[in-house]
Design a protein with these regions (language model features):
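Detector for C-terminal structural segments
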Residues: 1-12, 48, 52-61, 80-196
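DNA breakage-rejoining catalytic core of tyrosine-based enzymes
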Residues: 14-20
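Charged, low-complexity surface patches
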Residues: 18, 53, 74
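Immediate post-signal peptide segment of exported/extracytoplasmic ligand-binding proteins
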Residues: 22-43
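Short glycine-rich hinge loops at helix-strand junctions in the catalytic core
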Residues: 68
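Conserved active-site histidine-acidic residue motif and adjacent donor-binding/catalytic loop
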Residues: 75-79
Length: 196
């Protein structure tokens, strides 16, 4: 868990900050006034772009049911999904992969405060500061430290959380030369040549 999926440069596993503890979850829900007489219900929207999205949404729904929370899955086409998340429309959470991250700041355009795509709708300029510090820092060790601090901050505030990236595979044989792996972000074969 974190703001970037495992395998992305400077990834830090922050799962320990949000351990799976159903008893504690039920207690927190009770403290917030939710229980059998007043269950917490939320909308979990996803789209039809990839078949794995509705599977992930179903897993989340089942996990929520274990702590007596109801997740109502709303499955829509990709265009409807985009139009909905870009507005203050009826959704609470969504499942999407947006793009496989190449760096921590690949998705800054959807999580900085001035962004029209600020999906968490937060106003915390510390997020902007983290991105700026990360982008300016050239020392790999200092950059990694900023990334760790930012991921821990984001998990604490729950501004953005990623459980995993979507399954995406590309295969290149050893005889395929000049192939560059860019995750799911871009797939280029225009400079590739075959070494016979």
């Amino acid at each position: 868990m974190g703001i970037i999926p495992p395998g992305t440069p400077d990834t830090v596993d922050v799962t320990h900050l949000c351990p799976y503890d159903p008893a504690k979850a039920k207690a927190l829900l009770a403290d917030a006034g939710y229980g059998p007489q007043k269950p917490l219900t939320f909308a979990l929207m996803t789209n039809t772009e990839k078949s794995v999205f509705n599977v992930i949404a179903t897993v989340i729904k089942e996990q929520m049911a274990r702590v007596r929370v109801t997740a109502n899955i709303r499955l829509v086409d990709k265009i409807t999904w985009m139009n909905t998340i870009l507005q203050d429309a009826p959704w609470d959470l969504f499942v999407e992969d947006l793009l496989s991250l190449l760096t921590l700041d690949s998705n800054a355009f959807i999580s900085t405060t001035p962004s029209a795509w600020n999906q968490a709708r937060h106003t915390d300029t510390k997020v902007d500061d983290y991105y700026a510090r990360y982008a300016r820092e050239m020392d790999p060790l200092k950059r990694k430290a900023i990334a760790k601090e930012f991921q821990e901050f984001s998990a604490d505030k729950l501004y953005w959380n990623t459980i995993s990236g979507s399954p995406f595979y590309m295969v290149a044989q050893p005889w395929m030369k000049d192939y560059v792996y860019n995750a799911e972000f871009e797939v280029h074969y225009d400079r590739v040549w075959l070494d016979k």
